[in-house]
């Protein structure tokens, strides 16, 4: 009896699980009030109360009616029902029909009227003898009872099991019915129904509807079934196994939408219970948790109003260093405009250099992001330049003071991500369907310099050749990719339950990535590099300035001493009022001069190669009046903007309509802030827009079409390195002695060489680009931008800058706040990274950066536990791969205009920077430990404090190759 199958009988108050012996005689008695003589339990029990017919689900009604299908069921198989009126206490069975009467249509009419009876009648069940089914069906049920999920077992409580020892086997009827049939006469209800005035309809038609609804009702109820706590009862003296249905109402309904992964821990089935169907019926299948892909009707992608097909990217707050705008894609992922072949660098690392994976952010894929541009503003806007010299009369504040950013937030665009534009990044099982869509599949073009194969980009055309390997998506971090996509495109109600509203998603954590957001007052001609943000500025209160497209007087900025600005006229109208400029960063700039290799995106949105992606250069920038009289923040990034007069042409706006919004939808006009002016009067209020719709809808439609153009831009999606940190502290350092790529022009080469010579890059192989540090005792952040780093000199200044990142302040004379416990981990990881880079013969990490990250919030102390909570280990990651190249990319190296001087060796400038960091951190650690020992009076034991790190500094100090600046 221990291994006997179980029949779960759920109930809203109690439940049973009744064991029956494998092919052995046994009678199972379903007990409700713990009394074994309660075999005549009906639904009129006082503990339950009467149950009206309209309260029964279609599934239960179909269980009664499906058993009497005249096409598959014999007359002896008709179940018996006891019908009484709801307002009556009588439970006397009605008259039983004779076998002759079963041949008439009255019995079928009774069943049909039974469905239409509504609340006038209630149902009571009595213990009934069970039809003997075939041995095959019995064996299948026994096997399923052992392995079935609890939800499947709960659904089997609707069946009436039988003994396999009976002699009256009717294989044909039992195996072709969806549920086990019951052999008993049916009480006629036609007379009482006719007396009550209930309408009567054709029995055969209604029976067909009931039977057709059976599978649908079972599938609809499958996700809601729950099994109650079982109790075992047995009676060893019976020859048959019986079970009586006990009413069951689930106490808690599960969600109708469950975005599941393939490795979910529970089953997702189209039909919870096993179906025994006739040969004419279509067999139903189920998919278990071990399946490689979910079913076609997976609830994750029932695209309705609950599932967003377009999501808006939110700004990623307070980047550290740089000025490329980062956006938050989810809680665990961020994205930025794709520059050159940066994504192929990640994909090459995954395929060829997995040893670098611990030192790079987890790569997720490439997104096609939609930008909407208001074309009327291009013609109406007037370019107003701000003279930087006029605002530079007051000396800039000292680099250790912090000023707030007073500029008005003016976002030039808000990018949006749609499912239709990004089918390539979704796993196949996540897509709504696997056929060719009306929008078409993206055309695949072979990537010239990468072995990633063919890849999809824009899903607005029909694919000529299916992609062989996924382009623009990770091959390793698949689990993270699916978690991020599930989070972003989860149902709206699910996001509300989780307490995360996607459109209001924001993080209290500052960003680790580069920030062009710095505060500055009036500038001084002699010192334009000492700028910082106010320590009182709460990073949680405002959006990042990094996505502001402030506009400035380009000619005045170029005239400024020691400032270098790249300029490129994007679209030159006939008048000078519509001028638009494009800016580039040296970290993510295109260097290939072959303009014919960068096709324009036409109205058909023709595909273009990832190398031809112009990154953030797609943005059309316009000047805006500066009401505060200060220099917009674009001008202070001039040093990172490299000269390159031969740049790829911009992407032409694709004149396509928004497939997810109607023309008259006012949200379409207001989907993005205006780019031309900061004046709010130029914007169209929603109320005015609605009035225009009421007055002249056609005119508004034409106006909307003429005002908007859509551009597609590629964004790279990577892991959010600050995920899980309460107060991330970040240091961004530019690595290497060479900051220009292999496709740089002579002008760019000269500019970057001069820049490295003026900073610590040439001498140390590293320069500081920015940092943010959280001080727990002050409950505030301190920030330093890249211009502070450019003024730092090698020696004590560089060492003090690293100490400030570890928590030291000006008033911390005894280094009590210095987090020296991070230094051993830093040195260990820098040594590991150096060993990896030394093995990358022929590869170059030009203009890449290292990010140092740790959580500035100390871990909570658990007073109840004796063990001290260990803080999170500091992390080191490489970012900015736009100008990097691997030795495997033979084709690109062959076309290089500025190839590496030592092609067969490693990146010596990068190794020099790693060695510099190790030496400086080691010196900080020794001085901090020495000071602590000296204060305690143990100067003689000072050398013992160095034993912890002495073994780590095992590299050769006479490596002359690290002294060469030309790599």
UniProtKB/Swiss-Prot annotation:
Compartments reported by the entry: Cytoplasm
Modified residues (Phosphoserine): 86, 585
Biased composition (Low complexity): 278-294, 686-704
Major subcellular site: cytoplasm
GO cellular component, one term: cytosol
Keyword annotations: Cytoplasm, Kinase, Phosphoprotein, Transferase
Signal peptide range: none
EC number(s) stated in the UniProt entry for this protein: 2.7.-.-
Positions with biased composition (Basic residues): 221-234, 499-508
Name of this chain's protein: Uncharacterized inositol polyphosphate kinase C970.08
Record organism: Schizosaccharomyces pombe (strain 972 / ATCC 24843) (Fission yeast)
Taxonomic placement: Eukaryota, Fungi, Dikarya, Ascomycota, Taphrinomycotina
